[in-house]
Amino acid sequence: NNLSDDPSSRQEEIGYYGHKASLQAGLTPTEIIKYWKKYYNSDAITSDLIKFWDLPNYTVDNCSEGQRKRIALARLSLMKRNIWVLDEPTTNLDAVGKEKFWELHTLHLKSGGLSIVATHEPAQFERNKVIILARHRDNELKC
């Protein structure tokens, strides 16, 4: 299948995770995940995601940036996309949050997935097969 034939045909294969978590104010992580489950037609168990990401039971308005990132990362589990485009996926995560991300990311790669990542923490990604698009003078990856 040639990408130039119909680029929109690949849209369902790509999942984007941005630097800023865009979450609906006034909702709890459970409510947000239930919405995403329905949107992505996922059979994931909400309570399992809440437990895996150690998400709080209060509204996102009261969450720290790290908690907000964890909520947004839970969405990757529901997307069922072959290609992930990730912008600073580990920024604002504590050590436990980063380990949870790496566990999810490793599962994605082992299942045949691909990730395109913009990061200031390249060493973590270099444990996988990596193609570096550009490296900044201070050894930082740059696209």
What are the functions of these language-model segments?
Residues 1-9:
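ABC ATPase NBD Q-loop/coupling interface
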Residues 13-16, 20, 25-42:
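Q-loop/switch helix immediately C-terminal to the Walker
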Residues 43-58:
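Conserved ABC ATPase "signature" region
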Residues 59-68:
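Conserved ABC ATPase signature
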Residues 73, 112:
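Hydrophobic anchor residue at the start of the ABC signature
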Residues 84-88, 93:
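Catalytic Walker B motif of ABC-type/P-loop ATPase nucleotide-binding domains
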Residues 95-97:
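Helix N-cap at the start of a conserved alpha-helix in ABC-type nucleotide-binding domains
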